[in-house]
Amino acid sequence: MKILFIPNWRVNRLSTDVPTIQAPDKQVQGEPYWFFKYFPEGTQVDIIDIGKENQFRKIEHKIKFYLVQPWKAFCVRKRYDLVISHGAQSGLVYELLTSFVKRKPQHLMFDIGGLNGARVNHTEMPLIRWALRKAPHIIVHASRQLSLYAKHYPKLTPKATFIPFGNDVDYFTPKEVAMKKQILTFGRAKRDNDTLCKAFSGIADKKGYKLVVVGAGALKEKYPDGDIEFLDPMPLKDLVTLSRESAFIVVPLPEYLYSYGQMSFLQSMALGKALIVTETTSSTDYISDAPGVERLRHAPAAWTRQP
């Protein structure tokens, strides 16, 4: 089987493995790429990524869709048995192009961001319905996202499937280290770090613990509290070390009707860390009612009222 993979990120082509680069971001010569290592032996996977930054990419970022990459995929589609797009920014445009031709391979699209960020926009939605009128197969990593299709894109529902997001347990492994009296949170996009910092600041007796915030430096002036430390984004290997040294990890997620933040809390779990995560569309499928797991039915803002 020949597969063409079109992800909405750039993939590093390497002659030898670099362990500090996560599996989705690298293709090592002579080794199967990412989750395709679980496919039958002999499966050929070619990748067309989004390419290097340039002036045209700035236009693509502005319109929030990739154009060059899907066009390249469209031009070579006949060479493949299956085309897999990861992200609607790539998949929507590719599907639109192939809707005008009769001969095309099967198209499987991972819809991470709810097509258009799950926006109920009556200008955008008819265009999306038209682009997807041939209804490709779709995989989502948040089961609640299926309700978006049922309500606004009913023709997609029969071909949409929820499959839980996987984690690289070979890279993220538990390790015994000396823990510090610190609580860690990380990530800039789609994080309610403001509420977390406000809640932590309201705790009278912090028992000697500090909150370490990675990647949200814009809040530094708002929370000059010496018990909150702000760090710049760091290499993954350094973040893993910091995670292992922390007493526990908090992933404060706002609510969106699509997948986000899953790598952060699943990787933390794979490291064997105690974890607090907001129950949202993105996380609810990964929270089990099991010993050691407790669900607190509060909106994130309640943290500031009940620190």
Please give the residue ranges for each predicted region.
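Conserved catalytic-core segment of nucleotide-activated headgroup transferases in glycan assembly
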Residues: 22-23, 178-225, 229-237
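Membrane-proximal helix-turn-helix segments that form the acceptor-binding/catalytic region
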Residues: 71-79, 118-138
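Short beta-strand->alpha-helix junction loop in the catalytic core
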Residues: 115, 162-172, 217-219
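A short, active-site helix/loop in glycosyltransferases that binds the activated sugar's phosphate group
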Residues: 135-158
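Acidic anion/phosphate-binding donor-loop and adjacent secondary structure
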Residues: 147-151, 164-180
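Nucleotide-sugar-dependent
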Residues: 237, 251-267, 279-285
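Acidic donor-binding loop of glycosyltransferase active sites
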Residues: 243-258, 273-274
